[in-house]
Swiss-Prot record:
InterPro entries: AAA+_ATPase (IPR003593), G_ENGA (IPR031166), GTP-bd (IPR006073), GTPase_Der (IPR016484), KH_dom-like (IPR032859), KH_dom-like_a/b (IPR015946), P-loop_NTPase (IPR027417), Small_GTP-bd (IPR005225). This is GTPase Der. Keywords: GTP-binding, Nucleotide-binding, Repeat, Ribosome biogenesis. Residues 3-167, 181-354 form the EngA-type G domain. Disulfide bonds: none annotated. GTP 1 binds at residues 9-16, 56-60, 119-122. It holds the Pfam family KH_dom-like. NCBIfam families: GTPase_EngA, small_GTP. One of its GO terms (biological process) is ribosome biogenesis.
Length: 447
């Protein structure tokens, strides 16, 4: 599980700047969901080998009772509930403001671990920066500059330590949570996730457990299908009632991110009776960004006429082009149709994500691809692609060595990706291609 850090403060104290600084390794913004654009943004970051989730909130004015500011305050309160640690940001240049006192009063009542960060402190002495803010009763302030990065790593390091103190299970490895292929079923509310869970587990013996803590902790459901062990990771807020799991359908970005990170394969479930939404596309973006193997299930397919089915397939091709590496299955979780093929694709996607690719074959495919179509020249030189080897798995990473590779176009990179996918039958997994330019040993020599 990844620690969750919420950034809270009044307007214009630098929360978004700090958010972007913290999440730079993952291109900052991971989620910007409809209805949340003025309040909560979610991103993934990493300090060394420790990943975390950051939540950027809108300007917080807890005493306002109506209007858009009140709605922003509501969303900020939700971020605090989701967080393991709250970083309360104030403005060192402007000093202590009445809104800061109101926010501090609110945060004290929540019982959350809170760190006080005095932003915009570059060029200022710590004693003068911190003096105003001790009266908030939030402990020793951390002087930082989100814009320049000063003090940010130390701040996040301490936040992660506090998170582990709050929830010791955060320090544990996720690898032991569940047997077999770990599957996360994700999607917006009411697409049929709980029905699919019940269909998959059938009458098999189920071991379900709640990890200690709050609603943002996961449920793992172990089951067998065709003699193979699997573990389902809940993202829908499933709770067991008798032998049936029912969904408390409230979409949680944090739970979705956590479950995707913990999974081997993700099933993205869509509703055939509703148009593809921005939220569907955002969830798909989470999965691609994470590098997880993917199978797409289009649920509630039963009862649709041929014209409607053709229209839906056209919309899927148009709106989810970036998921072309995945298998799409048209299923009915309620009627239990198409589930066998869906699970076969889960197995295939897992195998593709974990595949071992020998260097000689990788290099041969590269040479054949270049022979068929060379990369375009960039100025006076043409990129020279020499050899390839595997740089990692889950997702597979292919590292290509050569000269002048910085000028290889995105179009040519996609061409190579397609050649490798076809050669090794890599269906269902993202594929990363990295270019490494060899140093020219004669670059510094003179004629």
């Amino acid at each position: 599980m990844k620690p969750v850090i919420a950034l809270v403060g009044r307007p214009n104290v630098g929360k978004s700047t700090l958010f972007n600084r913290m999440t730079r390794s993952r291109d900052a913004l991971v989620a910007d969901l409809p209805g949340l654009t003025r309040d909560r943004h979610y991103g993934e970051g990493r300090i060394g080998d420790r990943p975390f989730i950051a939540i950027d909130t809108g300007g917080f004015e807890p005493v306002v009772k109506e209007g858009i500011v009140a709605e922003m305050a509501k969303q900020t309160r939700q971020a605090v509930v989701e967080a393991d640690v709250v970083i309360f940001i104030v403005d060192g240049r402007l000093g202590l403001a009445p809104q800061d006192r109101a926010i501090a009063d609110y945060l004290r009542k929540t019982g959350r671990r809170v760190m006080l960060a005095v932003n915009k402190a570059e060029g200022m002495k710590y004693t003068s920066v911190a003096a105003d803010f001790y009266e908030l009763g939030m402990g020793d302030p951390y002087a930082i500059s989100a814009a320049h990065g000063d003090g940010v790593r130390e701040l996040v390091d301490e936040a992660l330590e506090l998170a582990v103190q709050e929830r010791p299970e955060l320090a544990e490895e996720d690898a032991d949570s569940g047997k077999g292929v770990k599957i996360a079923i994700v999607g917006r509310p009411n697409v049929g996730k709980s029905t699919l869970v019940n269909t998959l587990i059938g009458e098999e013996r189920v071991i379900a457990f709640d990890m200690p803590g709050t609603t943002r902790d996961a449920i793992y459901v172990e089951f067998e299908r065709g003699g193979k062990p699997y573990t389902l990771i809940d993202t829908a807020g499933l709770r067991r009632r008798g032998k049936v799991f029912e969904a408390i359908e409230k979409f949680s970005v944090v739970k979705t991110l956590q479950s995707i990170a913990d999974a081997n394969v993700v099933i993205l479930l869509l509703d055939a009776q509703q148009d593809i939404s921005d939220q569907d596309a955002h969830i798909a973006g989470f999965i691609v960004e994470s590098g997880r193997a993917l199978v797409v299930g289009v649920n509630k397919w039963d009862g649709l006429d041929g014209h409607t089915r053709d229209r839906i397939k056209h919309d899927l091709e148009r709106k989810l082009q970036f998921l072309s590496f995945a298998n799409f299955h048209f299923v009915s979780a309620r009627e239990r149709t198409g589930i066998g093929a869906l699970m076969r694709s889960v197995d295939d996607a897992y195998a593709a994500a974990m595949v071992k690719l020998p260097t000689p074959q990788l290099t041969r495919v590269l040479q054949e691809a270049v022979e068929f179509q060379q990369p375009k020249r960039a100025g006076v030189s043409r990129p020279k692609l020499r050899y390839a080897h595997q740089g990692g798995s889950n997702p597979p990473i292919i590292v290509i060595h050569g000269n002048a590779l910085s000028s290889v176009s995105e179009t040519y990179r996609r061409y190579l990706e397609n050649r490798y996918r076809a050669a090794f039958k890599l269906k269902g997994t993202p594929l990363r291609i990295e270019f490494r330019t060899n140093k020219n040993p004669y670059a510094d020599s003179k004629d």
